[in-house]
Amino acid sequence: MESKPFTLPSQSATVLIGTQFGDEGKGKLVDYLSDQYDIVVRYQGGANAGHTICFDGKSVVLHLIPSGIFNEKCVCVIGNGVVIDPVALLEEIAKVEELGYTVKGRLFISHNAHLIMPYHKRLDALHESAQGGQKIGTTGRGIGPSYEDKFARKGIRVVDLLSPGLLQEKLRENLAEKNKLFRNIYEGDEIDVESMVREYEEFDKLMDPYITNTQLYLNRQLRQGKTVLLEGAQGCLLDVDHGTYPYVTSSSPTSGGACTGSGIAPNHIGKVIGVCKAYMTRVGNGAFPTELNDATGEMLGRVGHEFGATTGRKRRCGWIDLVAMRYSVAVNGITELALTKLDVLDGFEEIKVCNSYMLNGKEIRDFPTDHQTLSAVQPVYTTLKGWMASNAAARTFEGMCPEAREYVAFLERELEVPVTFISVGPGREETVFR
């Protein structure tokens, strides 16, 4: 009997990740690239991340729905690695529909994704306030407590909405435990079980059209030759395993997290695009070696409009850190870089780039992820000439001013990865591809 020929993986999936502390401008790139892909997948995080998309004179922030939703030919998937607040998701669906875009039939939600419950959000706020000076700087959206329940095997999943009896049972079990915490530890009010049961039974009807086995769906689509873009939230340096622990998020924004959070095998991935700002920002607490607590940092924040899309919090600003970037390139297997917000540097006569650190009198080029060591390093800078001109009209690399081109070339030489995308302004069209 003749053997059946093997079908090799298509490698038609691309992962797009943040290489820094999040807020790198991934939303613009996903929106721009979505017309080149059949499916866009969000694979981790929750409503704690905001992706801002600018088009047709509008600025839209999405927290859960993938940025590809604004391309009518693109299907969007919320993967099993995401934790979903049903209230936030339904509000977001309504917002997208109000803008005139079709959602039903174009958005699919993994039946294995976990739900963020009201008690998760309350626990998040109570726990953070109890930390005093040791606050992590969470968004208060219930992300951490939801992931805690997931890994403690107590979580409620999207699929549970489809079984009212099971949903009630799980809600009662969870609330019995959580109400003890509210009553005995935090000395607060309990959450009413019956009202929550009624509320979440309604979510079954509203979310049912979107729920499916997305792992099965995605693998079938890949076998049929469809292309997939996997969209990460936050950034590599906030990864729960590879980030600046404990000042991290509760999930895995890395390229490895793309596989576990979507159900797509690694051998389907052909490219890993790393998104980085031309400078650096961080929201919340945690070590930040190149942070600028001076007029330069204020200028970066003001020109770059550096306020969190989710919380509105002011972002901490500093020069780009290539020690951290080299680490991100290695951990994620990045094949190309997308450089965003280059226009924010237009008004600087000199631009500094951190190439190494000083630690206890020694120069180091490796990134320490433990908070204590990272807090002790001092950045060593290389100073480059600024360009003091706008590149907003440039649509080719050659059309950019020489100093801006040299800045990009310097990053490529140091990181040994090509920069294939350069954002020279917030608009969709203000983009240079190479």
From Swiss-Prot:
Annotated metabolic or biological route of this protein: Purine metabolism; AMP biosynthesis via de novo pathway; AMP from IMP: step 1/2
Record field: catalytic activity: IMP + L-aspartate + GTP = N(6)-(1,2-dicarboxyethyl)-AMP + GDP + phosphate + 2 H(+)
Enzyme class: ligase
The keyword Plastid is annotated on this UniProt entry: no
Residues given in the record as substrate binding sites: A309, T310, T311, G312, R313, K314, R315
The enzyme's E.C. designation: 6.3.4.4
Cofactor list: Mg(2+)
Catalytic center residues: D23, H51
Gene Ontology process terms (BP): 'de novo' AMP biosynthetic process; IMP metabolic process
UniProt keyword annotations, A-Z: Cytoplasm, GTP-binding, Ligase, Magnesium, Metal-binding, Nucleotide-binding, Purine biosynthesis
Residue ranges that the Swiss-Prot or TrEMBL entry lists as coiled coil: none
Residues annotated for IMP binding in this entry: D23, E24, G25, K26, N48, A49, G50, H51, T139, R153, Q234, T249, R313
Cross-referenced InterPro entries: Adenylosuccin_syn_GTP-bd, Adenylosuccin_syn_Lys_AS, Adenylosuccinate_synth_dom1, Adenylosuccinate_synth_dom2, Adenylosuccinate_synth_dom3, Adenylosuccinate_synthetase, P-loop_NTPase
Alphabetical list of NCBIfam families matching this protein: PRK01117.1, purA
Family in the record: Belongs to the adenylosuccinate synthetase family.
Described function: Plays an important role in the de novo pathway of purine nucleotide biosynthesis. Catalyzes the first committed step in the biosynthesis of AMP from IMP.
Subunit description: Homodimer.
UniProt protein name: Adenylosuccinate synthetase
Taxonomic placement: Bacteria, Pseudomonadati, Chlorobiota, Chlorobiia, Chlorobiales
